[in-house]
């Protein structure tokens, strides 16, 4: 899986990139059919926000997480993405054709 990390109003450090790759590689191990993941780190007024977008089984899946600490926001976004993909996997497999 290719993980694209970008920043908005922030200078990305190697530590931030490593944190994103580390956290979201766990999602990759649970869902090997993912091809690409786009993660955007944003700094606003007093908050740090992480947006993650991907395609899973033909549907767009996106999650957002915000926190005072960027590393906590990254961890929350990874957990939310894993949860959203689990939900989407269950919905796709439970529908009758």
Where in this protein do the model-derived segments appear?
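N-terminal, polar/charged subdomain of small-to-medium soluble alpha/beta proteins
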Residues: 1-97
């Amino acid at each position: 899986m290719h993980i694209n990390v970008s920043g908005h109003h922030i200078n990305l450090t190697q530590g931030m990139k490593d944190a994103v790759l580390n956290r979201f590689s766990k999602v990759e191990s649970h869902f090997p059919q993912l091809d690409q993941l786009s993660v955007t780190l944003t700094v606003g007024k007093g908050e740090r926000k992480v947006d993650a977008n991907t395609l899973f089984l033909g549907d767009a899946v996106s999650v957002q997480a915000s926190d005072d600490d960027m590393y906590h926001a990254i961890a929350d976004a990874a957990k939310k993405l894993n949860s959203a993909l689990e939900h989407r996997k269950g919905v796709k497999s439970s529908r009758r054709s």
